[in-house]
Curated annotation (Swiss-Prot):
Protein name (record): ATP-dependent protease ATPase subunit HslU
Main location: cytoplasm
Disulfide bond positions: none
UniProt-listed GO biological process terms: protein unfolding; proteolysis involved in protein catabolic process
Residues holding ATP: 20, 62-67, 255, 321, 393
Family to which this protein belongs: Belongs to the ClpX chaperone family. HslU subfamily.
Pfam families in UniProt: AAA, AAA_2
Keywords assigned by UniProt, alphabetized: ATP-binding, Chaperone, Cytoplasm, Nucleotide-binding, Stress response
First and last residue of the signal peptide: none
Name of the coding gene: hslU
CC annotations in GO: HslUV protease complex
Assembly description: A double ring-shaped homohexamer of HslV is capped on each side by a ring-shaped HslU homohexamer. The assembly of the HslU/HslV complex is dependent on binding of ATP.
Organism whose genome encodes this protein: Helicobacter pylori (strain P12)
Length: 443
């Protein structure tokens, strides 16, 4: 199955392996992502006319909003960034401006493209690294030697390279020259300040500056890999491709959009800068040009997915212009006790499988009786009903509490198989769930 060419049905089938329920949300997002592919198959003139239909997801925390978008972006290898609306401030106030989310997307896109190019050149990079280390370990040939000596040296070099590749010489120490660590740039500042930062770095830090280090062969492989990668990769082409990919197929997931909605219930206590953030966000979602350290990017073809619980506000509390930019709305269902059970038993990388794998490292086998899993689902659901509803995240808390002693004393259980029963789950959790005050603080 081609990742970029996945049909909506294939996308939903993939999501079903990791996320239980939420059929409508999966369907809407699968169509939106498929339309990204469809648009790119059209003539350039028509491509410009078709803009993505942004999505507003409404649902409580822990019901799968972020996970749905993140999983699709990952499988389709699209530039993706998740941000929280509440972290941004209106232009002129202290804090991150909304344009920084686009700069973050471009950074992720360039990194994605760079990793793809590195993967293509993986064998070539490995060969160059091994050859360089082998030449360091073998003394160089003096000038004017016979052809026979040259051939002997070539054979010795080949054997040395084979031994390095097989890891036989990993513990040997060699002295190599490596580049000085580059100075970090804060990419979350306005472009003008970013350019000043880059110019200052050019003045105070020369790229060719190198220092001698004594490293093991294993460490030298990693140090040289990064250096040789930079020489073999076409950084300019990577930047251009990353910029283009972010522009045509980038996805920005804006979580907690409800936190910047101006609720009429809060009246005079409402933070006035919330509406300012919405107005700053509007041109980016509508389509504007944002300057990044890699160049300018147009935002009209970026897919925006906004999500929020909307407990204290309603989608209609967002400014009308912003509401209009999210024409597709999907309401996610709250998790039932049955769905909690299915999350524990039917997902590909369920929480139970994760904990079993973690404790297997210590030589501890963990088995859950079906009744124990049902009890976990029931008590997690009850805890959500009695205190803050945090959806599937509650399962992490309850399982952690049940396995706490086993995890702490793992060496005592090494080589054993521990069975988690319904009675054990009840003894660890039932008193806590029964006490509403304790639920708030412990679960």
């Amino acid at each position: 199955m081609s990742k970029l060419n996945m049909t909506p049905r294939e996308i939903v089938a993939y999501l079903d392996e990791y996320i239980i329920g939420q059929k409508e949300a999966k369907k809407s997002i699968a169509i939106a992502f498929r339309n990204r592919y469809r648009r790119l198959q059209l003539e350039k003139s028509l491509q410009e006319e078709i803009t993505p239909k942004n999505i507003l997801m409404i649902g409580s925390t822990g019901v799968g909003k972020t996970e749905i978008a993140r999983r699709i972006a990952k499988i389709m290898e699209l530039p993706f960034v998740k941000v929280e609306a509440s972290k941004y401030t209106e232009v002129g106030f202290v804090g991150r401006d909304v344009e920084s989310m686009v700069r973050d997307l471009v950074n992720n896109s360039v990194l994605l493209v760079e990793n793809e190019h590195k993967e293509k050149l993986k064998d070539k990079i490995e060969e160059a690294v091994i050859e360089k280390i082998a030449k360091k370990l073998l003394p160089p040939l003096p000038s004017g030697v016979s052809e026979e000596k040259k051939q002997e040296y070539a054979n010795s070099l080949l054997k040395m390279q084979q031994r390095i590749a097989q890891g036989e010489l990993d513990s040997r120490e060699i002295e190599i020259e490596v580049r000085k660590k580059s100075i970090e740039i804060d990419s979350n500042v306005p472009p003008e300040i970013l350019r000043v930062q880059e110019n200052l770095i050019k003045v105070f830090h020369k790229e060719q500056d190198k220092v001698k280090k004594t490293l093991s062969v294993k460490e030298a492989k990693e140090a040289l890999k990064a250096e040789i990668s930079d020489t073999l990769l076409d950084s300019e082409a990577i930047k251009m491709e990353g910029l283009k990919r972010a522009e045509s197929s980038g996805v920005i997931f804006i979580d907690e959009i409800d936190k910047i909605a101006v609720s009429s219930k809060e009246g005079s206590r409402q933070d006035p800068s919330k509406e300012g953030v919405q107005r700053d966000l509007l041109p980016i979602v509508e389509g504007s040009v944002v300057n990044t350290k890699y160049g300018s990017i147009k935002t009209e073809h970026i897919l925006f997915i906004a999500a929020g619980a909307f407990h204290l506000s309603k989608p209609s509390d967002l400014i009308p212009e912003l509401q209009g930019r999210f024409p597709l709305r999907v309401e996610l269902e709250n998790l039932t006790e049955e769905i909690m059970y299915m999350i524990l038993t039917q997902t590909k990388t369920s929480i139970i499988k994760q904990y079993q794998a973690l404790l297997k490292v210590e030589g501890v086998g963990i088995a859950f009786e079906d009744d124990a899993i049902k009890e976990l689902a029931k008590l997690s659901y009850n805890a959500n009903q009695k205190s803050e509803d945090i959806g599937a995240r509650r399962l992490h808390t309850t399982i952690e509490k049940v396995l706490e002693d086993i995890s702490f004393e793992a060496e005592d259980y090494s080589g054993q198989k521990v069975t988690i029963t319904k009675e054990l789950v009840q003894s660890k959790l039932e008193d806590l769930v029964a006490d509403e005050n304790l639920v708030k603080y412990i679960l």
